[in-house]
């Protein structure tokens, strides 16, 4: 499965539908995580349909929030800073292969996706994430390296 190709196709379609800027897409082993905020349920559903249209997609997790109020630049900056702090702490932690994870934060909610080498590593990643200032919740879509779910 070519995750990069899936990502490019989904982003291209989202751009064509005018919803690219408000949605973040992460892909891991054909599993797609959609996050962000849109102003209508129709746009949320459209993004999910776009993801499912890609032939190699195995699963779509739609965490897109519907909110009529536009997200401010300050809120985006705070969320980006949270993700950056988590990534930096993961890189500094000897027991974590940080390259195997993607992190996205929306409204203080941290979404983790990727492959953990072990339950211990995953617990460390979740713990690091929870300790960053501004984090309200951590939602993990991480799979363990040897999980039967990966096959």
From Swiss-Prot:
It comes from the Bacteria. Coiled coil: none annotated. Transmembrane segments: none annotated. InterPro entries: BON_dom, Lipoprotein_DolP, Transpt-assoc_nodulatn_dom_bac. This is Uncharacterized protein in gshII 5'region. Keywords: Repeat. SMART domains: BON (SM00749). Residues 2-68, 78-146 form the BON domain.
């Amino acid at each position: 499965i070519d995750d990069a190709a899936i990502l490019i196709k989904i982003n291209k379609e989202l751009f064509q539908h005018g919803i690219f800027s408000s949605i973040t897409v992460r892909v891991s082993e054909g599993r797609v995580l959609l996050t962000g905020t849109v102003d209508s349920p129709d746009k949320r559903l459209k993004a999910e349909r776009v993801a499912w249209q890609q032939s190699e997609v195995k699963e779509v997790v739609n965490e897109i929030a519907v909110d009529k109020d536009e997200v401010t630049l300050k809120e985006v900056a705070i969320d980006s800073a949270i993700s950056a702090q988590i990534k930096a702490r993961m890189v500094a932690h000897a027991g974590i292969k940080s390259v195997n994870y993607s992190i996205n934060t929306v409204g203080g909610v941290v979404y983790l996706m990727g492959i953990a080498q072990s339950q211990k590593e995953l617990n460390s990643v979740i713990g690091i994430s929870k300790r960053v200032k501004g984090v309200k919740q951590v939602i993990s879509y991480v799979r363990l390296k040897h999980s039967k779910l990966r096959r």
